[in-house]
């Protein structure tokens, strides 16, 4: 069963009341259904695979992985050779990152489910200790797996492009948003 990012009329109404331009976009675009990956390890793999490649390439590779592995778990990833993982279209470096993360999880060196008990900053700090994971990947995991609503990834190119289009700015700065508890809902249509 496909799961989607959870938000409702309350969040949309709040945003529309706070920002005229955003209200116009929400009225024009309508309800956005954005898939989430509730399995944290699968979401981690998804995030690593999607780094610095086109959306189309990411979707193609992700479909291959899902078709072959079914449920994506550390055990299933470790059971494959590097070459088998690369055949999905994953680069050697990303395969290394994914397998190292799977190994750390299986060895108990990294408690992926413990992330739920951490603040956003702590999640970023913990995930950034894994090879190949930085702030962007951690933010994507918090947003599209953990469904944390107060995430706005300023470094995400799609979000920057969307903000530029809505607000007609050349440069997007990382200034506080007056309705921070709803940041994720602002950008769902941009991703």
Give each language-model segment a name:
Residues 169-176:
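Short, charged, surface-exposed loops that flank catalytic or proteolytic processing sites
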Residues 180-187:
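Conserved small/polar residues in nucleotide/adenosyl-binding loops
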Residues 191:
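Cytosolic catalytic cores of cyclic-nucleotide second-messenger enzymes
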Residues 119-164:
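Catalytic DNA-binding helix-loop module of base-excision-repair DNA glycosylases/AP lyases
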Residues 21, 25, 53-54, 58-131:
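Alpha-helical ds-nucleic-acid-binding substructure associated with the helix-hairpin-helix region
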Residues 1-37:
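Intrinsically disordered, low-complexity, charged terminal extensions of DNA damage-control enzymes
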Residues 9, 39-43, 79, 123-124:
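Alpha-helical scaffolds flanking conserved acidic
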Residues 37-52:
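Alpha-helical scaffold segments that form or flank carboxylate-/histidine-based iron centers
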